[in-house]
Amino acid sequence: MDSEAFQHARDLLDLNFQSLAMKHMDLKQMELDTAAAKVDELTKQLESLWSDSPAPPGAQAGVPSRMARYSTSPVPEHFGSRGSPQKIATDGIEARFGRSESAPSLHPYSPLSPKGRPSSPRTPIYLQPDTYSSLDRAPSPRPRAFDGAGSPHGRAPSPRPGIGPVRQPGPSTPFDYLGRAGSPRGSPLAEGPQAFFPERGPSPRPPAAAYDTAGTFGSPLLGAGGSAFTPPLRAQDDSTLRRRPPKAWNESDLDVAYEKKSSQTASYERLDVFTRPASPGLQLLPWRESSLDGLGASGKDHLTSATLPRNYKVSPLASDRRSDVGSYRRSLGSAGPSGTLPRSWQPVSRIPMPPSSPQPRSTPRQRPIPLSMIFKLQNAFWEHGAGRAVLPGSPIFSRAPPPKLPPQPPPQPQMQPQPQPQPQMQPQSQAQPQTPAPQQTWSPMNEGLLKSPAELEPEPELEVLLAPVEEAGDADEGTVTRPLSPTRLQPALPPEAQTVPELEEVARVLAEIPRPLKRRGSMEQSPAVALPPTHKKQYQQIINRLFHRHGGPGPGGPEPELSTITEGSEARAGPPAPAPPAPIPPPAPPQSSPPEQPQSMEMRSVLRKVGSPRKARRARLNPLVLLLDAALTGELDVVQQAVKEMNDPSQPNEEGITALHNAICGANYPIVDFLIAAGANVNSPDSHGWTPLHCAASCNDTAICTALVQHGAAIFATTLSDGATAIEKCDPYREGYADCATYLADVEQSMGLMHNGVVYALWDYSAEFGDELSFREGESVTVLRRDGPEETDWWWASLHGQEGYVPRNYFGLFPRVKSQRSKI
């Protein structure tokens, strides 16, 4: 009984539905007849207006007027009724399933229809809860209906495949797209001309077919100009629907007229009417870098000015319609609205162009300047390698710039520091106005060394050093000057670099690079510069000449050399070794040296008298200065001797630079191996946060990177200036980039996966929250999860039976083994 009653009720409901549907079809037929009559009347009026002109121009020129009249018609005909391209029966079926807005009887039957497809931009008002099942993709940044809208057939794929054959010949695709893909924030559609291209979410593979077809305007049903994708004004959209129905009207004359109106000339006129207001804001052309430039200059500050892939389209009101997508894109790490997409989403076949909109930091480019470009600006012969091929011996002198390199006048840096060393020297130096040739080699060096970093011009020491050497051509050729430490040197740019437009950006990047890289960047110079002879054992020869007897130079030579070198080295070393300068000139020698110098030329030293029972203290160079300089120049024996005299081989200078930094930047592999074996800290950062691994990565030196990683280098250590890891410092414009970047990427991926997820703590860490783990240096931690959405910098790990979050940048793939070396 229940089933029979249910069947009876269902039949009754079907009958009621059919009767109401027939009534609705009759209503639609009446509306259609009214529209046809109005069309006939308007056609007659247009024919009477254009009777004086030839027929074809009249037919073509009549289209805009007809479109305007239809768009402003007071008859309550909406998109579904006026633009229906189907037959009468088909239109009735469409109307039964919710194609009309004007029929008030639509609402009681909308819940019964699972195929409701509203076509108005304001359709969310009429949607019932049941219809959301097929329209839940409306707010999506990738509406499916839009893919079909740009297809060659001009067909919008329906959520239900059964309705497809009925809607196949219809040209009302743009309005289905407006209906289904319209966001609840769709009110800006009527404010002005705009391109209704959705700002897609950051998908790595956006569908290219729909955009390519629309971008090239190759659709056969969209007219010659692709007018269906022009800014969607309602008048234009209504005329688009009424302009190209294949078979909708019964009047054959009107059919022929409408077929003529769909020619190219009519579409051109329509483009002139509707696309000109939109052209200043957005050019509907295939995507180019200039499109983004145009957008940046139009004053749309809220637009994302990033370099988008080729398949992306941009809308002037993209942030209004897709603000959620924009916020998601901005949350991916960009500093502001001008940030770029992540590197993995950028097209690899194109170099991204910098946007023209003002940047927050007023920097003209989005990605950092490669080191090779900076090296090229520092040295005009970087590409040719002329300096390295011609200049022999140790590279310390080959790094010297020509005397007239800086734009500042060179005599002033030489003459200003003259009063500085005089008060520090003993009376013996003040009483010697006339000095022989060897003093001319050492005195200017002392002047440059005693200058404070604030007074230093770009590398004035080398500049001061070269000028007297050229003047003293008759001096002893065996005299070898002591090489300078890179710790006090500043970057110097050649004259041709002044014409580079990115000079300010280069200077900013240079200020963030550690001194060893700056020093390494000026290695090769012009071979035409006259340089003094170079030798491998420079330090040993200097020490032998200073502290051992031999009959080469006169008595006046060693006297200024001794005091000057000592004071210069101690001034360079600064606070670490303040004691040696005081006892170097004993009280007795200064009393005897002023009268003895003009009288007797037999004296070879001022340290002690011949036959003196007291053994005078010898001058001693700071081992830190020796270590830093020898590590850069590649003198392993000097490095070994200096390390023996130091407690810590990783002792930094005032800028945090260690001997390991210098050895890596100088590509001195034996010294790197020796320092690591001696217990040097492979994670010692300088004042900019650059670890030795950053320096090795910037040189694309895979061998040194491997050695550092295997001895406990921190893979995820970041710099202070830009927060970059080692892999981000690899130079893509230099040889070895692929190998070095691949190795570092493999190491990053292996962290927490290799060795059963075991990583080794490189520093101590105290937990700040309850879900974190505390650990000490050297402890092994097992990583349990590292790919969570909130675990980019924190990994879930276990230690001593407890689980919690640990910072990934505190760990290395291998432990750092400290050498048990005792001081000698």
UniProtKB/Swiss-Prot annotation:
GO biological process: apoptotic process; cardiac muscle contraction; cardiac right ventricle morphogenesis; embryonic camera-type eye development; hair cycle; multicellular organism growth; multicellular organismal-level homeostasis; negative regulation of inflammatory response
Protein name, as recorded: RelA-associated inhibitor
Subunit structure: Interacts with TP63 and TP73. Interacts with RELA NF-kappa-B subunit and with SP1 via its C-terminal part. Interacts (via SH3 domain and ANK repeats) with p53/TP53; the interaction inhibits pro-apoptotic activity of p53/TP53.
Family membership: Belongs to the iASPP family.
Task performed by this protein: Regulator that plays a central role in regulation of apoptosis and transcription via its interaction with NF-kappa-B and p53/TP53 proteins. Inhibits p53/TP53 function, possibly by preventing the association between p53/TP53 and ASPP1 or ASPP2, and therefore suppressing the subsequent activation of apoptosis. Is involved in NF-kappa-B dependent negative regulation of inflammatory response.
Record GO terms (molecular function): identical protein binding
Pfam families: Ank_2, SH3_9
Expressing tissues: Most abundant in skin with high levels also found in heart, testis and stomach. In 15.5 dpc embryonic heart, expressed at higher levels in atria than ventricles.
Compartments reported by the entry: Cytoplasm; Nucleus
Matches recorded under SMART domains: ANK (SM00248), SH3 (SM00326)
Main location: cytoplasm
Phosphothreonine PTM positions: 123, 275, 307, 340
UniProt entry keywords in alphabetical sequence: Acetylation, ANK repeat, Apoptosis, Cytoplasm, Methylation, Nucleus, Phosphoprotein, Repeat, Repressor, SH3 domain, Transcription, Transcription regulation
Disease entry from the Swiss-Prot or TrEMBL record: A recessive 14-bp deletion, which gives rise to a truncated protein, is the cause of the waved 3 phenotype (wa3). Wa3 mice have open eyes at birth, a wavy coat, and abnormalities of the heart and skin. They develop focal cardiac necrosis at an early age which progresses to fatal dilated cardiomyopathy. Higher expression of pro-inflammatory cytokines is observed in the heart of wa3 mice compared to controls.
Keyword Acetylation: yes
